[in-house]
Every structure is written in C-alpha cells, then in structure tokens.
From Swiss-Prot:
Residues 252-256 are annotated as: ACP-binding. Its EC number is 2.3.1.180. The lineage of its organism: Bacteria, Bacillati, Bacillota, Clostridia, Eubacteriales. It catalyses: malonyl-[ACP] + acetyl-CoA + H(+) = 3-oxobutanoyl-[ACP] + CO2 + CoA. It is an enzyme of class 2 (transferase). One of its GO terms (biological process) is fatty acid biosynthetic process. This is Beta-ketoacyl-[acyl-carrier-protein] synthase III.
Length: 326
C-alpha cells in the first residue's frame, strides 16, 4: 500500500491588522492584559475577503508549492465553521475557482480540530481508492461570528486560511493519527444556536445567536489534557521520543495552553512552533497557516519528524505524526 505525504502548503491572511491597542478602544481591555493572558499581539481581520476567497488563495499557493496542476487533484476537503453559504459547499466553490474539475469536494465542521480531521479523512480516502492527490484547507472568517463587545472572546480570534496537498508516495510521510470527540462538554464552546420555534408553518424571521461563547476555564483544562493525551498517544504509536521530534505544531489558541502542555510533557516550550502573536486564533486555519509559514521560512527539512495537534469546539481533538517530505 502506498504511503501518503505532504507535498505542498499554502496560506492566506488578510492585510488588515487589528492590534491590541485598537481593541482597547472598543472594549475594556489593554495590550498588557491581552498579551499576558494569551500571547496575542495582533490579529488579521478580513475587509471584504470572504471564506471562499481566502480558501481559494491558500489553495493556489499550495498547488504552486506542490508543483502540480489543479486538475491533478482528486479530492478537496475544506474545514470551516464560517462558510459563506450552506450550498454550494466551500470546497465546491474552491473547485470552481481553481479549475479542479476531477476532484470530489465536501466541507467538514470540527472547529479548531477541523484541519486534523480533514487530514485523517483524506488519508483514509487516498489509501482505499483510486484517488492520488488531495487538497485539505482550513479556512475561517471568525470576525463575523465574534461578539465585539465581549472582551473575553473578541481579543482571541482572527481570519485566514491555510492549505496542504497530500499525495500517494513511496516515501515515509503521514504515519499515525489520534483523534476523538467529547460532546458531553460541547456546551463550553458554542456558536449559532438555532431557535426551536422556527418552523415552515410560521413566517417568523430566522433568529439565531451568531456569536462565539466560551467557558475559558473549562476549555483551558480540556485543551491541556487533550494535547497531552494526543501527543503521548502518538509517541506510543510511533515509538518516537520527543527528543527526535523537531517541532510540535499545535492549534494556535493561547500561549499559556502551550506552556502548560510543554511542562506536562517535560519538554521545552520552544519545541512548540507559535505564531499566534501575529494571527490570534484562526480555528481550523491555524495549523495549516503555521505549517505553511514554517515551510516558507525553511524551518523544516526532509525527514524531519513533526507532530500536528489540535483541539476545539465540539469538543474535538486530534493529532498526527508526519515525516516531512518537501
């Protein structure tokens, strides 16, 4: 059976930068308060760029980086909480924009774990079918579902998209996954609760709560536990020692979560790649944006061992061990 490797990456973030100082003019906060509690200095907020546009731009970069054509793609999966439409899917819209006429396309919704889930689904589909190449995108326009009057959440999130292309290869590449869900704790991170009285028999306008709501303490506790469990499980499956792992690329939610996880694993914080100071929490886009940034900066060499790990609403979590092949 063929191996599956990452052969290209891409990303897109809006040019519009919103600083902590700016946020302090609209909610009761400060640069110092945000920095010390989250590690975030600024975030990118879309100015007209929708989810499809950002996803498409990241896809174009990944295709170029992989040195393939769009019609070489057999599968497109987009992980997003913030689609522009329910139909057509964001993946189908990206297919149209890039001309990937041979691709099967669909979206998934797994919050900040979405990119990891997308990788696992794509690997399974490539291994068990005639398909050879897949495009996985994490794309979010979170600014449209953030409550800009809630200082506990509006300081956290940003917009952007990241993408990776997978291909069947003879080289060692994507090795082991560990993923799961805990719906019992889903109430701690929510968005978009539809009203039960919206029925075909009523002419009421659809009402819904569009804003992200989060129980920060519970999510922090869950995140540290899920990250630790996932990384340890992947180590057990791969027989990797953390000293062999060049980088852990985690969901970019909060620097404190990463620091606590590093302590639990008895490893240095610098093993975790972080760029949340520039982009904030971009949900499903955060891991592929970080991966592409590392690729562009030349931080990853062929045969490097890396672990990707995510956690988020649902509640969801997941991780994957990868031997870098670019």
């Amino acid at each position: 059976m063929s191996n599956i490797s990452v052969i290209g990456t891409g990303s897109y973030v809006p040019n519009n930068i919103i600083t902590n100082d700016f946020l302090s003019t609209i909610v009761d906060t400060s640069d110092e308060w945000i920095r010390t509690r989250t590690g975030i200095l600024e975030r990118r907020i879309s100015k007209g760029e929708n989810t499809i546009y950002m996803a498409t731009e990241s896809a174009k970069e990944a295709i170029k980086n992989a040195n393939i054509e769009a019609n070489d793609l057999d599968l497109i999966i987009v992980a997003t909480l913030t689609p522009d439409n329910f139909m057509p899917s964001t993946a189908c819209s990206v297919q149209k924009e890039i001309g990937a006429i041979n691709a099967l396309c669909f979206d998934i919704s797994a919050a900040c774990s979405g990119f990891i889930y997308g990788l696992e689904i794509a690997c399974s589909m490539l291994k068990n079918s005639f398909r050879n190449k897949a495009l996985i995108i994490g794309a979010e326009n979170l600014s449209k579902i953030v409550d800009w009057e809630d200082r506990n959440t509006c300081v956290l999130f940003g917009d952007g998209a990241g993408a990776a292309i997978l291909s069947k290869t003879k080289e060692e590449g994507i090795l082991e996954f560990h993923s799961g869900s805990n719906g019992l704790k889903g109430e701690h991170l929510t968005c978009g609760v539809l009203k039960a009285n919206n029925t075909p028999n009523k002419n009421d306008r659809l009402e819904k709560n569009n804003f992200i709501k989060m129980n920060g303490k519970e999510i922090f506790r869950f995140a540290v536990g899920a990250m630790n469990e996932t990384i340890c499980n992947i180590q057990e499956k791969t027989k990797w020692n953390l000293n062999e792992v060049k980088y852990i690329i985690s969901h970019q939610a909060n620097s404190r979560i990463i620091e606590y996880t590093a302590k639990k694993l008895n490893t240095e914080k610098d093993k975790f790649y972080m760029n949340l100071d520039k982009y904030g929490n971009t949900s499903a886009a955060s891991i592929p944006i970080a991966l592409d940034e590392m690729n562009k900066r030349g931080l990853l060499n062929k045969k490097d061992k890396i672990i990707l790990v995510g956690f988020g609403g649902g509640l969801t979590f997941g991780g994957v061990a990868i031997v870098w092949s670019i």
